[in-house]
Amino acid sequence: MLLTINLSRIIMLNQLIKVSLLISFCGFMTACAGNKMKEIPLVKQVDLPKFMGDWYVIAVIPTAIETQSYNAIEHYELNLGGTIATTFTFNKGAFDGPLKTYQPTGFVRPESGNALWGMQFIWPIKAEYRIAYLDVQYQRTIIARNARDYVWIMARTPQISDENYLEMTSFVKNLGYDMTKLRKVPQDWSKKTSINDKPVN
């Protein structure tokens, strides 16, 4: 049993290392491209306490670990030191698939209006995390990257209206993303009694 647990941890660590290195490489290549790709604008100011809590992933251009995600949720909690304790959970492959949990730490970049974070899965790599869109009510957000490699469309509810979805996907398209890579994340909480039933490892 202990051997099985250790093997699972090793496999997960290897996945995180691969994803972190890939994200860093994409960021490096973007920097080398100079002015070929414009910097994605940040929202002017983010009220961090108001931004904390659960965000359902509505659609994504995914990293390697989330290509088969179902019921994906990103949860943020503000630490006393100002970092962001992040818990990303989803079922892999199906609504009843194995639960996956990742717990990176967000580091808010100074003088960014709290809209630019470095998301650290493994030390010392911090992946770029840009809050490019946030509605006034803090109900919908878009997390983007200058490399245009990954993007996350998220909301406080598992589903959003067709009108809001079209608005947000159009926003992503206008940022310069390849929309053929966008995956709508299946969300079905009909068998859950409350948000507290979200997957937790």
What are the functions of these language-model segments?
Residues 7-20:
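Bacterial N-terminal signal peptides that target proteins for export
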Residues 32-201:
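A beta-rich soluble binding module of mature secreted/lumenal proteins
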Residues 21-26:
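Hydrophobic helical h-region of N-terminal Sec-dependent signal peptides
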